[in-house]
Structure formats: structure tokens, C-alpha cells
A protein has these predicted regions:
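Acidic-enriched, low-complexity/disordered segments with a strong bias for Aspartate over Glutamate
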Residues: 32-35, 53-56, 71, 86, ...
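Short, charged low-complexity intrinsically disordered segments located at boundaries
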Residues: 38-43, 52-63, 76, 88-96, ...
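N-terminal alpha-helical interaction blocks
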Residues: 1-69
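Long, charge-rich boundary regions
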Residues: 108-178
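Cys/His-rich short segments
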Residues: 66-135
Length: 178
């Protein structure tokens, strides 16, 4: 996919403030990756996968977020299942004394060192992905892209669907507010 001129201009600015290797890897990601890989990107995992310096990658993603390439989110995680209990644009959004996990049905007191991750999602102004409209995702894709954190290593689609079929007795999709 060829990036629009406006996005190319943002990458020109990013090249001025971040190291070239991470910027090139991010540009390739935005151009070539499927939608799912552009939702909740973990900078540390990205660095490891591409053999890049963690600090350089973190810097590139932070600068990219400031330039509007990514939306940065602070995710509160369930330590038991890895689900995202809450998400906000700043650390100040961690205000509750307890967060309840809908999957585990347990309350958790937030601890910043164990329950918070920072992720980056492509901005809809740069490239629109399915996760920008979570209400349109099937329940399976919703859990894969929205509910579980970047640290949950899920299998390929076929294996995942088979596993869900074998372990799920019934499912019902509810419209928002139901």
C-alpha cells in the first residue's frame, strides 16, 4: 500500500527526530501489515521481532504518536487472563480503586508495575483498520483485537477458531447497551 502524501510528510518529520532503522520498520509495518498488526502495538515486542534497539523503537513510537501516526494508550490488564480492563490516553486515567475483569469475574486493585502496558494503534487519519470500529467486529475478532492485551500470544485464525469451538458451549452477541 502506498502511503498518502500527508503521511509521507509526517514520516519526513519523524526521520528528523528518531533513528532511521526503527522509522523504516514502522513505515513498512504501516504499508504492509494486516489490520490486526496495527492495533495495540507493543513497542518492546516490535523491537525484539525486528532485532532493533528497544530505546530507539520506543523513541520512534513516542515521536510517531506526537506527530499523529499513532494513538498511544495506557491499558490496565487483568493479571490472570491478560484481558484489558480499561484503557486511556494518559496514565491519569488510572483512577479506580478496583477494576473488574468480565472474563475472570474478579476485582483487581491496579498496580502500575504489573497491570499497565503502553501500546500504539495506527491513527485512523493514517490508515483505517477494523479495530477503529470495534462494534463491527465478530465476537471472536473483538476478543482477539480489543479485549486481550498485546502480551497474549494467540494462535493462527484456524487454530484459534477450532479451540474456541471446542471450549465454548454457547455464545450470544449483544448489541451495545443490551
Amino acid at each position: 500500500m502506498k502511503l498518502p502524501t500527508e503521511t509521507e510528510n509526517v514520516f519526513s518529520a519523524l526521520r528528523q527526530s528518531a533513528k532511521p532503522k526503527p522509522v523504516s520498520a514502522i513505515e513498512k509495518l504501516i504499508e504492509d501489515a494486516p489490520d490486526r498488526e496495527l492495533c495495540r502495538i507493543n513497542a518492546l515486542a516490535f523491537a525484539a521481532r525486528h532485532g532493533l534497539d528497544e530505546d530507539d523503537v520506543i523513541g520512534a513510537f513516542l515521536h510517531g504518536a506526537r506527530l499523529g501516526l499513532f494513538d498511544m494508550s495506557w491499558n490496565i490488564l487483568c493479571p490472570a487472563c491478560g484481558g484489558i480492563l480499561d484503557s486511556g490516553a494518559t496514565l491519569k486515567t488510572v483512577r479506580q480503586a478496583e477494576y473488574r475483569c468480565v472474563l475472570c469475574a474478579r476485582g483487581r486493585e491496579p498496580t502500575l508495575d504489573e497491570m499497565v502496558e503502553v501500546t500504539f494503534t495506527i491513527s485512523p487519519r493514517v490508515r483505517r483498520i477494523a479495530a477503529h470500529d470495534p462494534g463491527t467486529l465478530s465476537w471472536l475478532e473483538y476478543y482477539r483485537q480489543i479485549f486481550w492485551s498485546s502480551g497474549v500470544d494467540l494462535p493462527d485464525d484456524e487454530t484459534f477458531a477450532k479451540w474456541v469451538k471446542e471450549t465454548t458451549l454457547d455464545s450470544r452477541e449483544l448489541l451495545p447497551g443490551e
